[in-house]
């Protein structure tokens, strides 16, 4: 069993992309930018930075400040509308019951804890690295290494779980195993494992898959 499970938030534990893509599409239209839902959704699933770069390159009048303003609107609209994936809470509970620990590593800020508390999941997580904690973004290994160090954890006992290659990249670069989970594509990944649902992920975490 992997004793330390490092989770990504968006698209991994919480089903946030449908809501955020809808909000971004609607708010972009207020700036005269018309992109279809599928484009916004697919770009954000690579990374929100990828979406921002796409918009900045395509629309000369679009700015990072406008992007940040839309992000703020999205976050403020999430409570009561964004929920954990079915099976996420149960798996996190079983990890704790088996003597393991859940950690969170997300580019999201304090709203991660707000939504986790709303879902009754906050107490299932022992440690967090969130936006604003001063670490370079994924796939840099710094945050993963810091989590391991401050919890006195052995690398062989830890796994990074995320829906994007940058999540797995941060684990790979830190020297730990990773699982690409519920991803839009499983090609060209550095992850040791791939899983399409929580039942498959459970088997990986609990050592039933080698």
Kindly label every feature range from the protein language model.
Residues 1-3, 93-96, 100, 109-210:
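Asp-based, Mg2+/Mn2+-dependent phosphohydrolase catalytic module
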Residues 2-90, 94-98:
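N-terminal helical cap/lid subdomain that shapes the substrate entry/recognition surface
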Residues 13, 84, 104, 160-161, ...:
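Conserved SAM-binding loop
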Residues 10, 107-110:
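Generic detector of contiguous secondary-structure segments
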């Amino acid at each position: 069993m992997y004793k330390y499970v490092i989770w990504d938030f968006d698209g991994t534990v919480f089903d946030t992309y449908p809501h955020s893509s809808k909000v971004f599409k609607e708010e972009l239209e207020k700036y005269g930018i018309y992109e279809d839902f599928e484009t916004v959704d697919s770009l954000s699933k690579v990374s929100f930075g990828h979406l921002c770069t796409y918009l900045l390159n395509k629309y000369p009048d679009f700015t990072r400040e406008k992007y940040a303003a839309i992000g703020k609107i999205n976050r403020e609209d999430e409570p009561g509308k964004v929920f954990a994936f079915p099976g996420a809470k149960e798996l996190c509970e079983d990890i704790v019951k088996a003597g393991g620990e859940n950690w969170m590593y997300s580019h999201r800020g304090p709203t991660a804890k707000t939504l986790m508390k709303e879902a009754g999941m906050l107490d299932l997580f022992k440690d967090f690295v969130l936006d604003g904690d001063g670490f370079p973004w994924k796939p840099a290994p710094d945050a993963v290494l810091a989590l391991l160090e401050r919890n006195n954890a052995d690398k062989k006992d830890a796994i990074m779980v995320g829906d994007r290659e940058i999540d797995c990249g941060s684990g790979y670069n830190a020297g730990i195993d990773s699982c690409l989970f519920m991803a839009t594509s499983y090609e060209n990944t550095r992850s040791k494992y791939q899983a399409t649902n929580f039942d498959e992920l459970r088997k990986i975490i609990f050592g039933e898959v080698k």
